[in-house]
A protein has these predicted regions:
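EAL-family c-di-GMP phosphodiesterase catalytic domain
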Residues: 1-7, 14-19, 67-74, 93-108, ...
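Catalytic core of bacterial c-di-GMP phosphodiesterases, primarily the EAL and HD-GYP domains
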Residues: 2-10, 35-109, 185
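Conserved, function-defining core regions and hallmark residues within catalytic/recognition domains
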Residues: 28
Length: 227
């Protein structure tokens, strides 16, 4: 978080209305889930993202948010593996993430899904880490590569010592386990400095980069080593 290097991007889904304005994911994801077509949107988004990676020879990581519905879709991994092979993408540079609140519904299904994900060479991240009651159980049970720390902890770090303590302890534990940490909602230089001071590996937020249709050249991230 202290080097200023770009090493990753996260995909964001948007739909352009007829008047040219953009509709955010929060406006259509739930509708797509109810209609049973969210997996089709996920597939379309991934195909566009992988094509862009191939066109630009992008070398960084790409984080992709998953709907919990994919956990029960057997064709998801087959289709995703087919896409990365078609576009010549190293699956180790693709990180699929689920929010912590989405992981609590069926541990066995999630465990099977993550293990299959890892067998195909992809990476796995837990988003909003620390927002639920089972955070540490996840990183004990699942082969997690990244944890994205709940943004509320990050935005309050400068004025709340308890939040700083939470972030520091998550960072220390993750380092011991060989898991990389990402601070979300980093929106000022002061917060970035505070995050770097706790040993967090990567930072994400408006201060480090805003949504864009282009891929900023990125460097490869070396693997984390257990402490």
């Amino acid at each position: 978080a202290s080097t200023g290097r770009v090493v990753a991007h996260e995909t964001l889904s948007r739909i352009r209305r007829e008047d040219g304005t953009l509709m955010g994911a929060g406006e259509f994801v739930e509708v797509a889930e109810r209609m049973g077509i969210i997996h089709k949107l996920d597939h379309l988004m991934m195909e566009k993202a992988f094509a862009r990676m191939a066109e630009t020879d992008y070398q960084g990581l790409l984080f992709i948010n998953l709907s919990p519905r994919v956990l029960v879709l057997g064709e998801f991994l087959r289709e995703t593996s087919r896409l990365v092979e078609f576009y010549g993408i190293d699956p180790g540079r693709v990180v699929f993430e689920l929010t912590e609140r989405d992981t609590v519904r069926n541990f066995q299904v999630l465990e099977d899904f993550v293990n299959d994900l890892k067998l195909e060479g992809f990476k796995f991240a837990i988003d909003d880490f620390g927002s639920g009651f089972s955070s540490y159980h996840y990183i004990k049970r699942f082969p997690v590569d990244y944890v994205k720390i709940e943004g509320d902890f990050i935005v309050n770090m400068l004025r709340d010592g308890r939040d700083r303590a939470f972030v520091r302890n998550i960072s220390n534990l993750a380092q011991e386990l060989g898991i990389r940490t990402i601070a979300e909602f980093v929106e000022s230089e002061e917060v970035l400095e505070a995050v770097a001071g706790t040993g967090i590996d990567l930072a994400q937020g408006f201060h480090t980069g805003r949504p864009s249709e282009t891929l900023t050249p990125a460097e490869a991230v070396p693997p984390a080593e257990p402490g």
